[in-house]
Regions:
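The canonical Cys-X-X-Cys-His
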Residues: 222, 267, 271-283, 332, ...
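Membrane-embedded segments
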Residues: 152-156, 164-241
Length: 353
């Protein structure tokens, strides 16, 4: 083993931890850093909506305030670390004595003055943004009425008779008023990329607004725990040019499409004459149920069960047969649908666009 000779004393350098190589200590420090950061990084997802990726004026203000707080916090953290390092590394000269009662200007400025400036700045910016978020749309702005149910969203447009579910459209570049109600428990309407949360409280009509700077589809979510399927209470906001928005309003007011194939006609008959019509409505037919979502445009929706599964034939068939296996606890009981009729029902529902 390598040894060092210090006068008449030999020292084993391999057994002394202070003599270990610097590369080894750096590798251990890097490994510890990775292990500590891994749990935090596992929560990141490129597909999840983020309030820090704003697509509207409302969320933009929230994101800017967040970044202001973040960088101010980083500055304070850096200041504290520098002072701490200085206190640990710089020793006081032995010939210097502390005079009790002397003015500590540094402590006064760093400990009271700087925090005061930060608090006043953040408070002023917060008040400015709060006032901007409270700036309501004009009287001619479209008004969308959203009602939260366990666990889906009913969507109507003021002045339009039809209804849809779990999907609302807005014109790009325009403010849209959103009136919120709950049919049961407390919910919270949140579109991270467009607007902060607004709670839905029983017996009250709450208002917020949406404004999208660019076209696209933005996922929203109930942000208040509301029971078993709270996680599967999502919705979609589709921002599109004004002409497409007007076309959506026209489709919302029109009767559902007429079946064009024999399978679709058989599916419509099974839907209207079966138990489906007791809970669901399809405009222009004898199905006028008001318990579950209106299915007049179900074929064009982005998902089934408010974000539970994709809207395709396989998932739709599974939902019809027994939605409890897909979204346990929802209010739709298992259906005794004849195996020969199930493809017809799927064909009919997929034609409703």
């Amino acid at each position: 083993m390598p040894r060092k000779s210090l006068g008449s004393v030999s020292v084993d350098t391999t057994s002394d931890p202070t003599m270990r190589s610097r590369p080894e200590r750096r590798r251990r420090l890097l490994a510890a850093t990775v292990l500590c950061a891994a749990p935090a990084l596992t929560g990141c997802s490129s597909g999840a909506p983020s309030a820090l990726d704003p697509a509207g004026s409302g969320s933009g203000r929230v994101a800017n305030l967040w970044w202001l707080l973040f960088w101010l916090s980083m500055a304070v953290f850096a200041e504290v670390m520098v002072v701490l390092a200085w206190a640990l590394l710089v020793r006081r000269r032995p010939d210097v004595r502390v005079r009790h009662g002397q003015p500590l200007r540094f402590v006064t400025v760093a400990g009271a003055g700087i925090p005061l400036v930060i608090l006043v700045t953040v408070y002023a910016v917060g008040l400015r943004d709060l006032a901007a978020l409270g700036d309501e749309p004009g009287p001619r702005a479209p008004t969308i009425e959203v009602t939260g149910h366990k666990w889906w969203w009913e969507v109507r447009v003021q002045g339009v008779e039809g209804a849809t579910a779990n999907e609302l459209h807005v014109p790009v570049g325009e403010k849209v008023r959103v009136r919120l109600r709950t049919a049961d428990v407390l919910h919270s309407f949140w579109v991270p990329q467009l607007m902060p949360k607004t709670d839905l409280i029983a017996g009250e009509v709450r208002e917020t607004w949406l404004h999208a700077d660019r076209a696209g589809s933005y996922r929203g979510q109930c942000a208040e725990y509301c029971g078993t399927q709270h996680a599967h209470m999502a919705f979609l906001v589709v921002a599109e040019p004004r002409a497409q928005f007007d076309a959506w309003l026209a489709r919302l007011a029109a009767p559902a499409p007429v079946p064009r194939t024999d399978a679709q006609r058989r599916g419509q008959e099974a839907f209207v004459r079966g138990s489906c019509a007791g809970c669901h409505a399809v405009r222009g037919t004898d199905a006028n149920g008001g318990i579950g979502p209106d299915l007049s445009d179900v074929g064009s929706r982005w998902s089934i069960g408010a974000g539970a599964v994709p809207n395709d034939g396989g998932h739709l068939g599974g939902w019809i047969a027994n939605s409890q296996t897909v979204k346990p606890g929802n209010y739709m009981p298992p259906q005794s649908v004849d195996a020969g009729r199930l493809p017809d029902l799927i064909a009919y529902l997929q034609s409703l666009k």
